[in-house]
Amino acid sequence: EWFDAGLIGEVDEVFVWTNRPVWPQGIPVPKSDGSQVPEGLDWDLWLGPAPKIDYTNAYHPFNWRGWWAYGTGALGDMGCHLIDVPFRTLGLHYPKAVECSVGQVFIKMWSPEYIPEGCPPSSSVTLDFAATDKNKIPIKMRWLDGGIRPPHPDLIPANDSLGDESSSNGVMMIGSK
């Protein structure tokens, strides 16, 4: 409503963030632990086309989000909800360019690990969009997860929270006004 009413002007920068993941992410695939498949769960159906593995409580019912074979990490889990706001508001389409940086995992001291099957513990993704029919200038959108927060704007008092304090999610559109 603020954008459509012209109150924030043309938007050139958008920040979207979440405190997720709140599940294990950036860790190796769990080993089978002999857990029993819960009654009523068809484990083979749940796995779908993903690699067949033995059931373990490490995946189900919630933590599956942290491995690429079963989930999409914090971006796929929360991004679809939060990024929808600027997409609809600004009339965004496909980005012209995307750049990503992810957090490093250290399983042992001073020993970085590469765990390709696990989603990263944190990420920062920058998407560059062309001007749209609704917003006449190019837009840079930044997705932040894993505890990474956007810079605090000068116009907002330093002690004011950005976003919903209970969930640490937020969307901030920086306009010309």
Language-model segments: residues:
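A contiguous active-site-proximal alpha/beta segment in oxidoreductase catalytic domains
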Residues: 1-45
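Glycine-rich, aromatic-lined ligand/substrate-binding cores of catalytic
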Residues: 34-177
